[in-house]
């Protein structure tokens, strides 16, 4: 019987959150309110608990929700290298390995695999508390500055903080996050 080996990866900083984003929005009561972090190894990480309201079957997270979480953590990985740049999804392939329980503390991490000009490819994993990979993804993203995303959405990039777009620190933010060791 094999046991999962874990490593602690240091958190460098929290990442931005939005007021009303479905994944990270702190004001979105119907959302997931996931917290995102930049890690010292260049990856992005997410900590979250999916409420029962987002099930596909009783007690199981809807596949679209877990796919959205993976999409977000991989798209955010570019900001570790380029702080004012965000990944906008072009293509995402998600694989589901195990049922994902609702109302359970979960984690995910995303990484950049290759950067080519204005695009990048990345991958991500969503973990159960015991370190089992419950879902994984690969994707292609376009790099866009947050100012452009805001402008194209009809927002003033200079007032994003007023709409809740900011880095938030919480008293219970981790100094490091425990993840299974990856087989490179």
Put a short name on every predicted segment.
Residues 19-61, 178-184:
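Catalytic strand-loop segment that frames the active site of acyl-thioester-processing enzymes
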Residues 73-107, 113:
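Hydrophobic beta-strand-centered segment that forms part of the acyl-chain substrate-binding groove
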Residues 65-69, 73:
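Short amphipathic alpha-helical face segments that pack within enzyme cores
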Residues 17, 30-32, 42-44, 86-92, ...:
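A generic structural signal for short beta-strands and their flanking turns/coil linkers
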Residues 61-65, 83:
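A short beta-loop-beta micro-motif enriched in histidine and acidic residues
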Residues 48-50, 96, 143:
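Hydrophobic residues in beta-strands and at strand termini
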Residues 1-13, 100-102, 113-184:
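HotDog/MaoC-like acyl-thioester-processing domains
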Residues 35, 93-95, 107-111, 123-125, ...:
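Residues located in well-ordered beta-strands
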């Amino acid at each position: 019987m094999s046991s999962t080996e874990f490593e602690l990866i240091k958190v460098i900083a929290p990442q931005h959150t939005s007021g009303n984003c479905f994944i990270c929005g702190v004001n979105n009561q119907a959302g997931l309110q996931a917290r995102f972090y930049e890690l010292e190894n260049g990856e992005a990480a997410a900590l979250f608990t999916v409420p029962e309201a987002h099930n596909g079957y009783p007690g199981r997270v809807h596949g679209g929700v877990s796919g959205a979480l993976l999409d977000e953590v991989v798209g955010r990985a570019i900001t570790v290298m380029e702080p004012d740049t965000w990944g906008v999804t072009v293509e995402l392939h998600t694989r589901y390995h195990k049922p994902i329980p609702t109302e359970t503390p979960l984690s995910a991490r995303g990484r950049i695999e290759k950067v080519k000009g204005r695009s990048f490819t990345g991958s991500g994993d969503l973990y159960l508390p015991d370190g089992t990979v419950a879902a994984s993804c690969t994707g292609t993203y376009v790099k866009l500055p947050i100012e452009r995303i805001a402008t194209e959405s009809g927002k003033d990039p200079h007032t994003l903080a007023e709409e809740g777009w900011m880095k938030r620190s919480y008293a219970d933010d981790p100094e490091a996050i425990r993840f299974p060791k990856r087989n490179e």
